[in-house]
């Protein structure tokens, strides 16, 4: 009996994880990606001799599936993962504050950092520590938590505006791509419990030391080709048909393709366009997931102004800033990447407008930047970086299985229980692959019997 043929539509992290899982299980895999590259929302480009990422991506030690993908690709040596959580927080005119992992067991390991977080008054720090203790008891799978925002919940507990917009935003905005006031409490609890509170080492921060294309797309392409997968770039799927009692039919460049299974691993808006009603997926709900942007600012300076790998901001429009000098291939000076999540306010601003806001903010935050000469300043924008992780989205996210035989969904927008992160994307791809392989094994066993 020949190996089953599985088609994966989409070459982002979800699609790559699904394709590798299927190929490793012995399936014949074909991957179709509309763009000329793999990697999805994690990609690199050249700009005036610099190699830069579209945006800064980090992961945490708790991201088991993502770390497993790095191991499968053989690129674990291309990332840095902290031995112990240590996040420097800069605010104008103040010394650095630190969020560090202490020696106490979880969740008390962060108590000293929260109580010593000097950008907030002491009373606000105590309230934040008490809120963290309460969050550690909440169930992220409780549907009631998805009906309220983290900000509203914190306000009901007496948290100040400074604490909500400063400390709590710092902890969840980069992960949920939403400010704390607009983020689903359920997803925030997932982030805070899994990432910070349940395990003492869970929040140790990791990042790539190389451009993202060298971390994901290039090694994944090589691994898939070694596994015998067929890769088709610049190949858009024109239509998807679900037929009663049969596997799906794809139409690509006018040709019909009838694999044993299809894993639809594109973004949720593309999935909503492709999915027929017979798939049993609520495409109105998919469209209602919306989109949330990320804007990244790239600043090239004639000297070093940041002597840390990264720093978070408090009381400044700068959210997170990373030293990308080595990864960019620059030998002198410094390249900074400033990541702005939930960036609705910045998405439509021109490069000049962003420069006028963020260069003074950079100088206010890092005194050394006041004397530095700006050699270049440019932006990369992801208008649909993630779905909008607001209250009410839990019910909109579909499972990996559909009601159509042989059709499965993957993507960070599916019902993984995780937010729209690299970890969520990889988990979704693996779940879809496991479901497809399990169904094919059952189907073939029935045929053999």
What are these regions (language model features)?
Residues 4-31:
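N-terminal Rossmann-like FAD-binding beta1-loop-alpha1 element of flavoenzymes
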Residues 23-47:
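Glycine-rich FAD pyrophosphate-binding loop
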Residues 43-61, 133-138:
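Glycine-rich active-site loop/strand segments that organize a redox cofactor
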Residues 52, 66-67, 71-72, 76-190:
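Mobile amphipathic helical/loop "lid" adjacent to a hydrophobic cofactor/ligand pocket
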Residues 85, 235-369, 397, 445-449:
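Mid-domain catalytic core of redox enzymes
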Residues 187, 326-330, 382-409, 413-416:
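FAD-binding beta-loop-beta segment adjacent to the flavin cofactor pocket
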Residues 190-253, 257-261:
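Helical element adjacent to the flavin cofactor pocket in flavoenzyme catalytic cores
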Residues 414-436:
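A conserved FAD-binding loop/helix module that cradles the flavin
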């Amino acid at each position: 009996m020949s190996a089953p043929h599985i088609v994966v539509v989409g070459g982002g992290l979800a699609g790559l994880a699904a394709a590798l899982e299927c190929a490793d299980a012995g399936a014949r895999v074909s991957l179709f990606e509309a763009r000329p590259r793999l990697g999805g929302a994690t990609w690199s480009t050249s700009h005036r001799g610099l190699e830069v990422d579209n945006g800064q991506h980090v992961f945490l030690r708790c991201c088991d599936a993502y770390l497993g993908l790095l191991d499968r690709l053989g690129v674990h040596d291309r990332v840095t993962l902290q031995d112990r959580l240590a996040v420097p927080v800069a605010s104008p005119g103040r010394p650095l504050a630190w969020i560090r992992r202490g020696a106490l067991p979880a969740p008390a390991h962060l108590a000293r950092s929260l109580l010593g977080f000097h950008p907030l008054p002491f009373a606000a720090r105590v309230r934040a520590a008490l809120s963290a203790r309460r969050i550690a008891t909440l169930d992220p799978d409780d549907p009631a938590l998805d009906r309220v925002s983290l900000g509203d919940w914190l306000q009901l507990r007496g948290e100040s505006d400074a604490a909500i917009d400063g400390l709590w935003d710092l902890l969840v905005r980069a992960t949920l791509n939403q400010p704390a006031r607009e983020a689903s409490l359920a997803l925030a609890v997932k982030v805070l419990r899994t990432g910070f509170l349940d395990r003492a080492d869970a929040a140790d921060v990791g990042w790539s030391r190389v451009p993202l294309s060298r971390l994901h797309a290039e090694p994944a392409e090589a691994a898939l080709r070694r596994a015998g997968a067929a890769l088709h770039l610049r190949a858009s799927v024109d239509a998807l048909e679900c037929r009663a009692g049969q596997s799906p039919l794809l139409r690509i460049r006018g040709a019909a393709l009838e694999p044993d299974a299809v894993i639809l691993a594109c973004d949720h808006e593309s999935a909503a366009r492709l999915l027929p009603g017979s798939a049993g997926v609520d495409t109105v709900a998919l469209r209602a997931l919306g989109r949330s942007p990320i804007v990244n600012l790239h600043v090239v300076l004639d000297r070093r102004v940041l002597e840390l790998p990264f720093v978070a901001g408090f009381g400044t429009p700068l959210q997170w800033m990373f030293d990308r000098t080595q990864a960019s291939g620059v030998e002198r000076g410094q390249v900074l990447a400033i990541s702005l999540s939930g960036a609705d306010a910045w998405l439509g601003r021109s490069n000049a407008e962003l420069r006028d806001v963020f260069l003074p903010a950079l100088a206010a935050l890092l005194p050394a930047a006041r004397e530095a000469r700006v050699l270049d300043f440019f932006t990369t924008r992801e208008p649909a970086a993630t779905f909008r992780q607001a209250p009410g989205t839990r019910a909109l996210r579909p499972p990996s299985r559909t009601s159509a035989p042989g059709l499965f969904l993957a993507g960070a927008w599916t019902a993984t229980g995780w937010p729209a992160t690299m970890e969520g994307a990889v988990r979704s791809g693996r779940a879809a692959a496991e479901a497809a392989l399990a169904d094919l094994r059952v189907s073939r066993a029935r045929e053999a019997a």
